[in-house]
Amino acid sequence: MAKLLCTLFLAGFVFLANAYSTDPPNPPDIENVFDGIPSIFNPVNWISNIASFFNPSNWVSNIPSILNPVNWVKKIIDINNPFTYIPDFLNPFHYFPKLNPIKWIPGWIPGLGKDRCLLPKVTGPCKASLTRYYYDKDTKACVEFIYGGCRGNRNNFKQKDECEKACTDH
């Protein structure tokens, strides 16, 4: 709590200092000659931040973050790591772990993750005749069955290859 209060107190000085800037505002009648050109061709950006020139996401101005492979690595690490690290505000080189619940949900809830393959076959009380596949843990194979259409469990696949892909290593 003390760290948070200290951080907010110091942040107030930063905002106050920025409010009383000594730089004169840009005159409205003078146009910026670099307006309208992409940021990669803008020499002002080269000077202010050389690292941004080498970042591929800045080469195309409207590239979605999902298409940037740099973001893939971070998301893969966050999903596969049981802890996500969040920075400590007063010490930028110190990170403390925050539990990532997505990593642990399959262990908490039966039927999620690889545990779904260990569930028994459930046809359900409804009267539909849908061809589905379930993983039989005794034979270690995906077996066809008739699903009633309601109140089944997650060991219920529409296609055999989907069942095999999810449950082959059991």
Swiss-Prot record:
What tissues is it present in?
Only expressed in epidermis.
According to UniProt, where does the site described as Reactive bond for serine proteases lie? 127-128
Biological process terms from the Gene Ontology for this record are: envenomation resulting in negative regulation of voltage-gated potassium channel activity in another organism
What's the PTM story here?
A: O-glycosylated.
Q: Coiled coil located at which positions? A: none
Query: What's an example of a GO molecular-function annotation for this chain?
Result: toxin activity
Question: InterPro entries under this entry?
Answer: Kunitz_BPTI, Kunitz_BPTI_sf, Prtase_inh_Kunz-CS, TFPI/VKTCI-like
What protein is this chain from? Kunitz-type U1-aranetoxin-Av1a
